[in-house]
A protein has these predicted regions:
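A conserved acidic beta->alpha catalytic loop
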Residues: 3-12, 52, 56
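Short, surface-exposed alpha-helical segments at coil->helix boundaries
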Residues: 7, 11-15, 165-169
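Acidic donor-diphosphate engagement hotspot in glycosyltransferases and nucleotidyltransferases
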Residues: 10, 36, 59-65, 128, ...
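Glycine-rich, basic loop-to-helix element that forms the pyrophosphate-binding segment
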Residues: 13, 26-43
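Short aromatic/hydrophobic "clamp" motif used to bind/position activated sugar donors
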Residues: 48
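Conserved donor NDP-sugar-binding/catalytic core segment of glycosyltransferases
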Residues: 56, 60-88
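Conserved nucleotide-sugar donor-binding catalytic segment
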Residues: 81-174, 178
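Membrane-proximal basic amphipathic "stem/tether" segments
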Residues: 180-182, 186-234
Length: 234
């Protein structure tokens, strides 16, 4: 357990259960990723999970439930965010998935050997875990498994949610650091594109006439929608 000398009462809780904690320290750190890297150095297990202060495992049986699924480099479950269950819903993960979002480290189990090649980049305030996913899954070809288990209860309102400006700025910095601009142009263009129509494109491409017809139909619908909005404003 790595603490930064905060005064939220967590130290008293740790001391109460000190007999069940293998290692803990309370000292100043340089941010969340510095603290997480300190945890990596002290960890001796086969898999690592990083649970932030305030977050908690979903129930007492989570680790036993997840253990049989730990056969990949990164195993990811679900989280409870407020009253909703959040999680990655595809069987596998792609670079586009990471560009459009991220995977919460609180719901992730990492094979410890992954940190032999990369640690969390402490020069970032918010997106170093996102950068780590890109490095390990894209460049190191780490294996990935998505499971249905709910791993943790996540406390909303963290810095990644409340400081969107810094988050977006840091993500752009990661792009420049890891990818040539020419490689990222198409991905950046599609980053904000979220539409069920994308799933129809492969079928539409099989018939040029149908493709053009669908394009004209969508343009017409957008024109009508724009007219309706202007009428409502008036």
């Amino acid at each position: 357990c790595i603490r930064d000398r905060s005064t939220d009462g967590s130290i008293e809780v740790i001391k109460e259960y000190a007999g069940k904690v293998d290692y803990w320290v309370s000292e100043p750190d340089k941010g969340i990723y510095h603290a997480m890297n300190k945890g990596v150095l002290q960890a001796h297990g086969e898999y690592l999970n990083f649970m932030n202060s305030g977050d908690e495992f979903y129930n007492n049986g989570v680790l036993q439930e997840v253990a049989p699924s730990l056969d990949s480099d990164i195993v990811v479950g679900k989280i409870v965010h407020g009253t909703e269950v959040w999680g990655f819903h595809k069987e596998d993960i792609t670079l586009m998935d990471l560009i459009r979002g991220t995977v919460l480290h609180q719901a992730s189990f990492f094979r410890k050997e992954l940190f032999d090649e990369n640690r969390y980049d402490e020069s970032y305030k918010i997106v170093s875990d996102w950068k780590f996913y890109i490095q390990t899954l894209t460049f190191n070809n780490a294996t990935f498994r998505n499971i249905r288990s709910i791993v943790c209860r996540f406390v909303p309102g963290g810095v990644s949610e409340t400081d969107a400006g810094t988050r977006d700025m840091e993500r752009k910095r990661v792009y420049k650091e890891l990818f040539p601009d020419r490689m990222m142009k198409d991905y950046i263009r599609l980053e904000k594109v979220e539409s069920p129509l994308l799933e129809l494109i492969p079928e539409l491409n099989k018939t040029a006439g149908l493709h053009q017809m669908a394009y004209k139909l969508v343009c017409a619908l957008l024109w009508v929608h724009g007219k309706i909005k202007r009428v409502r404003v008036k």
